[in-house]
Each structure stands twice: as C-alpha cells, then as structure tokens.
C-alpha cells in the first residue's frame, strides 16, 4: 500500500508531511522550503505558477495572482465574506451559475476548489519527488469550524488534484496529534490555540494513555473564521495608505500595482516586528503624479502595530471562554497550551494567551508545521503504519430539523463526538397527512428561522391516519469527515428518503459565528419563544380534542353550552394568531372551563362503548417526540 500523505492546506501557506518509520517528516518543496505560499498565478503565456514563483511575480500581475482562496472555498457569492473580499482583492470574484463564489481569471470562470487543487498538486509532487513513487491518497486538514460545504469543497479540490482524500481532519486536532504522539505525556488536557492566515480555532483536547495506547479526544471546539494574519496585514496596509495620503495627498487604493507592493511590504514589516521593536516600510517609486515619482518611507514601531490590531487579538479570547465552558472545565484544568499558525509568533498574541491561561504556551511545537505533521500521523493511522492511536473529533454546531410551531429540534448537539448517528421518531401535525417536509437546520437557536437551513426534502406516501399516529423516523448520520447524511422513514409503510447535504447549501463561517453569538445574546428571547410555542401547542391540542368531542357528543349538550364552547374556541383560535402568551393561556383556561360538561359526556360515552375508542390513543410509542411536522412551503 502506498503512503497516505498529510497536507495542511492553509490560507497563506501550505505544508506536506509523511510518516518516515515512526516519525513524521515535513518535506521540502522544489525551492528548498518546508512551507509553500498558497498563491497561484496564471501568466500571460499560459503558464500556471504555484508558491514562491507565483508570489515573486505578483507585483507585475496582480489581477491574475490568486491568494487566500481558502476564504472563498465552499462559499456563496452573496455571503458577507465573499462580498467583503470582492471589494478588497485585486482579483475578480464573481457569482457562478449555482450562486457559489467563483473567480474570473483572464476571462475564464474558475471555482475555488479548482484553484486550491493547484496547491495540492504541488504538495503531491513534493511528496512524489521525495518518495520516488506515485502518491494517490491524502489526509487534508481544515479549520475546526469549517462547515459541510467547505469540507465538501476541500474534498473536491483533492479529487481535482488527483488525490483520494482518505480523511478530512480538523487543524487543532492535527496539531494535538503532532504534539502528543512522541511525548510521554500520560493523561493531559491541552488547549490548542490556532491563529492562522485566515482562520482562528480553539480546541480543548484530552489525551489519555492506557497500556501504551493514546486516545486524543476533542472535548470542545470554537473559533472565528474572520480572524487571521490576513486581517492583521489589512490593518497595517490601511494605516500605511492613510499615512501616505496625509503626507503626499494621494490614495494608493486606486493603484493595484502599488497595493500589491504594499501588501508584501506590510507582511514583511509585521513579521520583522515580532523580533524587532521598529522597522521601516521603504518603497521607492511607489507611484507618481504630474510632479514626478513618489516614495514611501514610514517608520512603524511594534507598539503602533499592537495598537492597530489589539481588538483582533482580544476577539480571540471570547471563543476560549466558550470552549472551556462547553468542555465543563476551568483554566486551571488545562495542563499545556499549544500555539499553531504563523500569527501566533506575534509577542502580543503569546502574552494574551499566557495571561488568559495563567501559563506560558509551549515552545516545542513548530506553529507552521504541526498541522501537516498531525495529518501525516492520521494518514499513518489509516494505513496501519501508526498503531495505538485513537482520534475522537467533534461536530462544531448542533444539527436538527424544524418541527411544529417553527421550532428547531436538535438531533445532534454541538461538540458531539463523530462519527455519530442519531434517530428520533416524530409524527404528523394534521389528520390524514400524506407527506411531510424534513427541513434540516444547523445552529444553536430555538426558532427554526434563526438557524441556517442546510436543505429540505419530502417524504410522501404516508398512510392516512389521525394526527399524531404516523411514525416518522428521522436519522442523522455524520461521517468521520464531519459530512452530514439525513434519512426519513415511515415506520408503517417502510418508505424512506435520504439526502446528503450538498456543498451549495452549506453554512459560511460568519453565519456560524453569528449563530453562536446570537444564541448567547438571545438566550432569554429563545426561552420565551420556546414557552410561547409550548403554550400554543397545548392550546392547539385542546381545540383539536374539543372539536372531536363536539362531533361525537355535542348533540347531547344544551344549545347555550354548545354555543359557549364554540365561542371560546373562536376566541382561543384568534389568540393563537398573536404572540401574547398570557392571552393564549387565559383563553385556553376559558375553553377548559366551558367545556367541562362536554368532557364528562364524552367520557361517559367512551365508558359505555367499553373504552374501545380509547385504545388507539395509547398506541403512540414512548419515544415519539411531542413536536410535529408541518408541511413547509418553499418561499419563492
């Protein structure tokens, strides 16, 4: 069996590693570097350049030099992230026919997985040159907060590059594997703080060692994928542009060539300021006007850079608190802190993390290489080269379906270990309902519409039955790559429908973050909404039952009692159209009071009939959830 290589497909840089005996080895590319810039250029003479050669010619070819493509992979054109990048990137971001964010290069439309595949091809070639044999299988890493669409798109990129992606693995988890594999760590709980070029993740991971076998179990994960080195660069670029404008009265933003030079200089200055207290951004002939050429020479101190990005660093702290809370741990329970991603070399980042955890982060993990090493270890586990290692990862957000009253009913909660499968039995909301719509949702809110819709499908051919009698079993199945499969089965007829959530309907990371933030900020509103829905459902059941009793025993009631019940039902139905929980409760109580006589008669009638009519209602299975389907009409 050939080697399964490990690839860290990064926003800014990528890296490839293999298992060499019992050790993972990071491989040098054809330029002699252990990491490769994730930059792809299409030249005028039709050549495709990847990595350092592409970066070197970016200044003279900004429109056709593509970088930070990972920020677009698996995204819709209308997503906030894609729209923001559209305005600031020198290359052209367009809408594909299916609504995805694509790119236009030299008049040709290209999909992000197609472009990322060029980087993966270079990683594949680097491994093949070292091994002297073809490579066809890989483990590729993604941010822990990547959703279904982004994971699918990453797998597609691998396939385009000629690789069978054996496993998609989360970056912080890969870093933990790299850290824990060759160390006699015993049982430890570690925090992996991963601040890369485009994304931020935090994972709390427990490493258990029993009889030489190590289990890496992710307890909780959180993150913010609008946070990374690219954002730090942007702050410095904006500062330099404004300073130049004050000094020379010219706005460099209108000049793509100048902006490309400035981007390179800002990145270099940021890196230098991790070891030096100040640096010069010196760009002669940056632009020109009628009076002649203009030069940029601006001093930047470390303190200035820190003041520009302080809020970005602070933004990474909130997810740390949430992850610890989700794991049920406190700061004192964390034994080791591991920093991953080039941006963690910034002293300010290291200090903030050390202050939060009350301990210095470990310095024996290479932040640029740890993720690729972990991916290679997982490749070794899958190929059988690495024994005695078990990896247990989690899903970052809750998954569920919409049920009666517009409620999100979770089937799999966030931070559940994957792969996992969960089934639950639901029922129908109407008498003789022949079809149900399964509306799949992702998020933490109680109200269905406040979560992200992942897709919907119909299960029809249900046998006609009174409401609440049909048994619809919904199954959610998440595979080891974190990709979701949903099925619905009518237990009476055996009819079944399945759906694999497709990439075009995935969540973007901004939405995930928004959901989690909203869930925290709106916990009280969610609780009130849940109570309102419960009250509504109880009232709805009461109306349904009373109407049935009226049909069966109403002719034995005095006319004025019957009229009073009908009026009370009308009043309750009117209250149900509003949002006032107190009014619904009051009208429910009113209906209960006036229908007391009717209930007595219905019970007497049932007793006289030997209780036959009561048998059917007892047949409802114990595990049927008291939340029901309504048919969801597509909003056109």
UniProtKB/Swiss-Prot annotation:
InterPro entries: ATPase_NBD, Chaperone_DnaK, Heat_shock_70_CS, HSP70_C_sf, HSP70_peptide-bd_sf, Hsp_70_fam
Inducing stimuli: By stress conditions e.g. heat shock.
Region (Disordered): 603-636
Gene Ontology cellular-component terms listed: cytosol
Coiled-coil blocks: none
Family the entry assigns: Belongs to the heat shock protein 70 family.
Nucleotide-binding recorded as keyword: yes
GO MF terms, alphabetically ordered: ATP binding; ATP hydrolysis activity; ATP-dependent protein folding chaperone; heat shock protein binding; protein folding chaperone; unfolded protein binding
A Pfam family recorded for this sequence: HSP70
CDD domains to which the protein is assigned, alphabetical: ASKHA_NBD_HSP70_DnaK-like
Residues with Phosphothreonine modification: 199
Keyword Nucleotide-binding on entry: yes
Taxonomic placement: Bacteria, Pseudomonadati, Pseudomonadota, Gammaproteobacteria, Enterobacterales
Organism: Yersinia pestis
Protein name: Chaperone protein DnaK
GO biological process: chaperone cofactor-dependent protein refolding; protein refolding
Job description of the protein: Acts as a chaperone.
Keywords, alphabetical: ATP-binding, Chaperone, Nucleotide-binding, Phosphoprotein, Stress response
PANTHER family per record: HEAT SHOCK PROTEIN 70KDA
């Amino acid at each position: 069996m050939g080697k399964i290589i490990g690839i860290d497909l990064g926003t800014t840089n990528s890296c490839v590693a293999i298992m060499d005996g019992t050790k993972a080895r990071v491989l040098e590319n054809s330029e002699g570097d252990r990491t490769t810039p994730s930059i792809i250029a299409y030249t005028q003479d039709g050549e495709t350049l990847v990595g350092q050669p592409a970066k070197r010619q970016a200044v003279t070819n900004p429109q056709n030099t593509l970088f930070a493509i990972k920020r677009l992979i698996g995204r819709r054109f209308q997503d906030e992230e894609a729209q923001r990048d559209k305005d600031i990137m020198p290359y052209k971001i367009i809408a594909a026919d299916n609504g995805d964010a694509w790119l236009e290069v030299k008049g040709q439309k290209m999909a992000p997985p197609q472009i990322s595949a060029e980087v993966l091809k270079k990683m594949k070639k680097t491994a093949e040159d070292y091994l002297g044999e073809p490579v066809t299988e890989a483990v590729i890493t993604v941010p822990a907060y990547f959703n279904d669409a982004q994971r699918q798109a990453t797998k597609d990129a691998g396939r385009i590059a000629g690789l069978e992606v054996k496993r998609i693995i989360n970056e912080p988890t890969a870093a933990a594997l790299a850290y824990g594999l060759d160390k006699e760590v015993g049982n430890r709980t570690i925090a992996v703080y991963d601040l890369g070029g485009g994304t931020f993740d935090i994972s709390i991971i427990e490493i258990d060692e029993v009889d030489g076998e190590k289990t890496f179990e992710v307890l909780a994960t959180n993150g913010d994928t609008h946070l990374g080195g690219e954002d730090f660069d942007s702050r410095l670029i904006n500062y330099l542009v404004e300073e130049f404008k004050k000094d020379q009265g010219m706005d460099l933003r209108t000049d793509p060539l100048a902006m490309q030079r400035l981007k390179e200089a800002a990145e270099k200055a940021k890196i230098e300021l991790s070891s030096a207290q100040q640096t010069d951004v010196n760009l002669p002939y940056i632009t020109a006007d009628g009076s002649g050429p203009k030069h940029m020479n601006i001093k930047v101190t470390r303190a200035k850079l820190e003041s520009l990005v302080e809020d970005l660093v602070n933004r990474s702290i909130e997810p740390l608190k949430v992850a610890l809370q989700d794991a049920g741990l406190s700061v004192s329970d964390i034994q080791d802190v591991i920093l991953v991603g080039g941006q963690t070399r910034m002293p300010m980042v290291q200090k903030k993390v050390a202050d939060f955890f009350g301990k210095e982060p470990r310095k024996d993990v290479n932040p640029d290489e740890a993720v690729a090493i972990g991916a290679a270890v997982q490749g070794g586990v899958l190929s059988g080269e690495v024994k005695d290692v078990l990896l247990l990862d989690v899903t970052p957000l809750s998954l569920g379906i919409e049920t009666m009253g517009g409620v999100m009913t979770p089937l799999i909660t966030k931070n559940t270990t994957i792969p996992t499968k969960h089934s639950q039995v639901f029922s129908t909301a109407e008498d003789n309902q022949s079809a149900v719509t399964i509306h799949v949702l992702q998020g933490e809110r109680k109200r269905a519409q406040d979560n992200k819709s992942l897709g919907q499908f119909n299960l029809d051919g249900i046998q006609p039955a009174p409401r609440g009698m049909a048994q619809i079993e919904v199954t959610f199945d998440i595979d080891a790559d974190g990709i979701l499969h949903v099925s619905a089965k009518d237990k009476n007829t055996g009819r079944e429908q399945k759906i694999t959530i497709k990439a075009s309907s995935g969540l973007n990371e901004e939405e995930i973050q928004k959901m989690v933030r909203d869930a925290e900020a709106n916990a009280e509103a969610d609780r009130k909404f849940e109570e309102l829905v419960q009250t509504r459902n109880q009232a709805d059941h009461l109306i349904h039952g009373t109407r049935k009793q009226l049909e069966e025993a109403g002719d034995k009631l005095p006319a004025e009692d019957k009229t009073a019940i009908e009026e009370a039902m009308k009043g309750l139905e009117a209250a149900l159209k509003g949002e006032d929980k107190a009014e619904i409760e009051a009208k429910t109580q009113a209906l209960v009071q006036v229908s007391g006589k009717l209930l007595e008669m219905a019970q007497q009638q049932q007793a006289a009939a030997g209780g036959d009519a009561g048998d059917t209602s007892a047949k409802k299975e114990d595990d049927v959830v008291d939340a029901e389907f309504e048919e969801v009409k597509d909003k056109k």
